[in-house]
């Protein structure tokens, strides 16, 4: 019975449970997804999916989650971190964060971060603690510490809580700096104590380094402190100058000026004053100064000492040593600058004085000093007339002036160019500058100086037409250099004695330089006067000089002719041509130029070729023309025909030929040999040394002199070969071959070239010894 009752109770409970329980229909995951998708398509539902797409959440719930994260992070949440934590796309987080910041004024969105007021209050408390510890803080420091924008920190944090949570004040000159009043008082105390201890100018940077105060605070508090001194500027190199030091400076400057009447800039600069001139003007506003490069001279020193002494010097016609009346520590440059400044201010007449190395000469003193030099200038002018120097200067000057007026026409220039080119081709075919020797060898050497005197001493071996044309062109473009009859040494020697008595001998040359041009012009004027007074005398002297030079050249040709006649055949012919093209050409030039001067013709150049002489001769008077033309033609003939033609020209010029003097001939030969020996001793070039040695041996062996260029060396050696012994011939031949090798070398620095030069150097002494010491019994007896 009891069991039945229990069964009834159980069934009743089950029935009641069935009545109370609602019917639920479970859906599968796929069905749920389809239902949500359908709701989203119909925009009946707004959800946010997670990054993995497995979960979704409503925006309202996501917003609550973001605020929870902000609270959990202490009031400052990075949206990137929130996105990672909630597993939601960052863009959805940023949109909701913007909405949160817009709806709630207590929350700020800043650089991808949400910040609430509680966090800002916390920051303000930290800033206040830091400001209390340091006394001064800047927004830039806070920016780096809290990683927040400077404007946000300044306006939303510091300025908002300044005077409340943050106990301090803002710098008026720099609103981004904040400090406490206690800090300002400490800085004032440091600055006041440091400046009170300074007794000399000190850099502000050094002061700030010692007291650990910032420069901007130093300058802002300086006026409030009112120190016993001043700061020169607010720049980096500013200095603090205490008043006691400035007073010491002023006392020293006043004392020095009172005692010396001048001030040195260097001395003032050493006192720590950078602009000395401005300081002097400020310190002495009522004084007048003469400001020089290194010193400033007071008006009292200028007026009472310098100007007064200069006036006395001018009145007594003496000289004045400025170094004795000016301060001793002034340099010579300072003294000269002071003198020029005094002259510029017209305290004295500048034309009455001459300044030389701190000595001021009155013009009257110098005039008296150089008075004897005027007599010397007249004497030198007479000497220049007597020896023909001035006459030659007048001729060259006249020719240059005429050439400058007439040279330059195109027709004449073309004609001269054609003549020069034809003559150059003719010279290349016949002169000793090119061609081969008797053995097919060519020795390119410099021409030996020949025995001649006067104007014939030109370099005949290089009768180059380009030089002649260039010389002519230069003479037409440039005026003749002014003749200097009086030299500076002449004046110096004459006035040195007088100056030496005064201890001023070191100024003799500078004084001479002042009067050199004046005395030279005086001498030239006197020479012109004498020249105009005796023209006939000058003409006779020129006539005699030309006659002497031509006779000397004719004697040389006759002596050289004896030597070249010892050669046979083609060698003799070439030597004759070379002799006439050199010495013969000089004779033609001498006589042609003389005749041109007699006929008052303009000559472009004194070194003429055949065509130029022919052109010039055509303009000469008839009495000279034929003789000069025949003489020019004879240059291409024999020596005898040239001498006959020259005699005809001399006769037309009223000149005579001197008789042959065999005793004098012997002296000329000996003198010629001595000159060759002297050149040999001075010679270092192998080719020229061989050339000289050959000519000396030829003269020693034959007793005759020879006029030959380097191309004839092999012929000369062949001619004297029979007279020399075998070792001597071998020595000369070996040296000759080595010279040819040197001349044919294309690379002077090669090993072969160096070897040849070493061999030549080794044989040089033997060749010179042979040329100097060789003798024959017959020759020695004749000498």
UniProtKB/Swiss-Prot annotation:
Annotated signal sequence range: none
Function, in words: E3 UFM1-protein ligase that mediates ufmylation of target proteins.
Class of the enzyme per the UniProt entry, highest EC level: transferase
Recorded family membership: Belongs to the UFL1 family.
Name of the featured protein: E3 UFM1-protein ligase 1 homolog
Family annotation (PANTHER family): E3 UFM1-PROTEIN LIGASE 1
Basic residues composition-biased segments: 446-457
Provenance organism: Drosophila grimshawi
UniProt GO BP: protein K69-linked ufmylation; regulation of proteasomal ubiquitin-dependent protein catabolic process; response to endoplasmic reticulum stress
EC number: 2.3.2.-
Keywords in alphabetical order: Transferase, Ubl conjugation pathway
């Amino acid at each position: 019975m009891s069991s039945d009752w229990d069964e009834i109770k159980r069934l009743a409970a089950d029935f009641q449970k069935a009545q109370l329980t609602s019917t639920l229909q479970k859906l599968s995951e796929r069905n749920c997804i389809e239902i949500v998708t359908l709701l989203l398509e119909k925009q009946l539902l707004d959800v946010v999916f997670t990054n993995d797409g497995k979960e979704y959440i409503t925006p309202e719930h996501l917003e609550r989650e973001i605020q929870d994260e902000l609270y959990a992070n202490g009031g400052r949440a990075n949206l990137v971190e929130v996105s990672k934590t909630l597993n939601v796309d960052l863009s959805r987080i940023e949109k909701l964060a913007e909405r949160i910041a817009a709806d709630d004024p207590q929350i700020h969105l800043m650089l991808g971060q949400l910040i609430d007021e509680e966090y800002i209050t916390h920051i303000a408390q930290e800033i206040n603690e830091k400001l209390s510890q340091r006394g001064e803080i800047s927004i830039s420091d806070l920016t780096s510490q809290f990683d927040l924008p400077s404007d946000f920190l300044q306006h939303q944090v510091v300025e908002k809580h300044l005077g409340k949570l943050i106990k301090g004040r803002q710098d008026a000159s720099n609103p981004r700096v904040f400090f406490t009043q206690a800090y300002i008082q400490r800085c004032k105390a440091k600055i006041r104590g440091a400046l009170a201890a300074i007794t000399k100018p000190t850099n502000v940077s050094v002061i700030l380094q010692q007291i650990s105060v910032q420069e901007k605070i130093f300058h802002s508090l300086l006026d409030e402190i009112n120190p016993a001194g001043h700061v020169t500027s607010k720049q980096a190199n500013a200095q603090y100058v205490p008043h006691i030091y400035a007073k010491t400076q002023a006392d020293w400057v006043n004392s020095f000026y009172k005692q010396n009447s001048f001030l040195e800039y260097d001395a003032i600069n050493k006192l720590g004053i950078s602009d000395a001139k401005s300081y002097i003007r400020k310190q002495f506003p009522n004084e007048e100064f003469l400001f020089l490069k290194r010193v400033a001279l007071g008006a009292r020193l200028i007026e009472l000492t310098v100007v007064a002494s200069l006036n006395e010097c001018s009145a007594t016609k003496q000289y004045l040593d400025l170094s004795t009346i000016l301060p001793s520590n002034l340099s010579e440059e300072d003294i000269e600058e002071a003198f020029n400044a005094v002259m510029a201010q017209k305290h004295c007449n500048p034309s009455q004085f001459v300044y030389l190395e701190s000595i001021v000469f009155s013009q009257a003193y110098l005039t008296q000093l150089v008075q004897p030099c005027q007599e010397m200038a007249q004497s030198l002018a007479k000497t220049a007339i007597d020896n023909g120097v001035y006459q030659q200067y007048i001729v060259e000057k006249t020719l240059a002036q005429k050439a400058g007026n007439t040279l330059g026409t195109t027709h004449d220039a073309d004609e001269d160019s054609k003549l020069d080119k034809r003559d150059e081709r003719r010279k290349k075919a016949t002169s000793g500058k090119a061609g081969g020797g008797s053995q097919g060898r060519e020795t390119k050497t410099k021409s030996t100086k020949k025995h001649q005197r006067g104007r014939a001493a030109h370099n005949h071996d290089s009768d180059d037409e380009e030089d002649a044309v260039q010389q002519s062109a230069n003479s037409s473009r440039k005026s003749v250099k002014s003749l200097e009859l009086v030299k500076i040494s002449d004046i110096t020697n004459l006035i040195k004695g007088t100056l030496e008595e005064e201890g001023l001998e070191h100024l003799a040359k500078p004084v001479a330089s002042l009067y050199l041009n004046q005395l030279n012009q005086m001498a030239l004027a006197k020479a012109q006067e004498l020249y105009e007074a005796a023209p006939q005398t000058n003409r006779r002297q020129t006539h005699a000089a030309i006659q002497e030079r031509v006779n000397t050249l004719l004697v040389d040709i006759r002596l050289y002719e004896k030597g070249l006649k010892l050669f046979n055949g083609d060698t003799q012919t070439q030597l004759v041509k070379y002799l006439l093209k050199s010495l013969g050409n000089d004779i033609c030039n001498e006589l042609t130029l003389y005749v041109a001067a007699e006929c008052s013709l303009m000559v472009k150049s004194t070194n003429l070729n055949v065509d130029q002489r022919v052109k010039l001769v055509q303009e000469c008077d008839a009495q000279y023309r034929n003789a000069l033309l025949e003489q020019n033609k004879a240059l291409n003939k024999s020596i005898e025909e040239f001498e006959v033609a020259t005699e005809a020209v001399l006769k037309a010029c009223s000149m005579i030929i001197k008789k042959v003097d065999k005793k004098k001939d012997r002296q000329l030969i000996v003198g010629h040999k001595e000159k060759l020996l002297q050149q040999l001793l001075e010679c270092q070039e192998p080719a020229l040394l061989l050339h000289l040695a050959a000519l000396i041996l030829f003269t020693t062996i034959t007793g005759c002199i020879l006029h030959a260029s380097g191309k004839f060396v092999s012929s000369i050696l062949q001619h004297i070969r029979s007279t020399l012994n075998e070792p001597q011939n071998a020595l000369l031949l070996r040296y000759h071959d080595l010279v040819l090798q040197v001349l044919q070398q294309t690379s002077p620095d090669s090993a072969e070239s160096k070897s040849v030069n070493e061999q030549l150097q080794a044989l040089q002494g033997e060749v010179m010894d042979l040329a100097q010491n060789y003798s024959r019994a017959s020759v020695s007896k004749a000498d």
